Amino acid sequence: GDQDDTYARYIRPLWPELRQMEMGGMTVGLAYNAQLRASKENQVFYSPEWMQENIRSKGPFGEMYRVWGDGKQMVKGDKFDFFGLSGYTVDELKKQGYVVWTGIQPKGSYLAEGDTYCFLNLIGNGLRGHEDPTYGGWCGGRTVLPDSVKNLPRMEQMKYRAEHYPLPDFTAPVMNGLAARFKWSVTPNYADANHEPVIKGALAMSAKPGEKLKLKYTVTDPDKDALTIKWWQYVSAGTYRGKVTVDDPASANTAFTVPADANPGDTIHLILEATDNGTPQMNRYHRLIITVAE
């Protein structure tokens, strides 16, 4: 929202009542050349084969989706947009007048998303990232650095964030969610498409240090798919920085003991994640916020 001073020079002067939230960190690779930084497991989502099967072949919306070597150019004569061309070397593109500012990828492979990051936390996936910028979600979250770190060089700040505020990798669920929505756009019958699991249960609890809480949740799938359950801690969202686990991370009905060294007022964010075995796989989350009582 702040690219090219859009917020400072346009949005804020005209709509001063709008709330701005700045997110930090990368939880999913959507930028140019994201495939170069992706893990081995996530490489598939950027390949020409995956893009064709899951995006480009899905009706008129899929046909409009930009990929490398698609023969398109957003604005005719744009010397920075050489993405639609294929079969040329960097030197050959430069001779044609293009400014080759990023590496060339195979024809049909993933190109890039734009302002999608700004939208991801608005998707109702159960992470509730839109409720509070510190919660975090598919597009990351806001963290408040200690004063001793704020004045350090940027690289030192990034190192500190990585060590003390680890972020989840949401690449697979985001890309699968994108693929599912493209399929929805060409699937008239609800039963012929895959959908997210449904999770019901408490959103908040409170307990004293050392106290055990019973966690009971209902997890179902509208398509009757088999589900995989996983509990995990969203470390950067809570004020308690220690690592915690539930008794049975693979069960929707389990228990959790508040750490003995937790202080009154500390918060612990636990995420219950359900993943189905449909095609494409879809995820649903449920954020439980535990506040340590006196």
Model-derived features: positions:
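Exposed beta-strand face motif in extracellular beta-rich ectodomains
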Residues: 266-270
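Residue-level recognition of well-ordered beta-strand positions that form the cores
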Residues: 218, 232, 255-257, 271-273, ...
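Low-complexity "stalk/linker" and mucin-like segments enriched in Ser/Thr/Pro/Ala/Gly
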Residues: 200, 233-263
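Extracytoplasmic/periplasmic beta-strand context in beta-sandwich domains
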Residues: 229, 252, 286-288
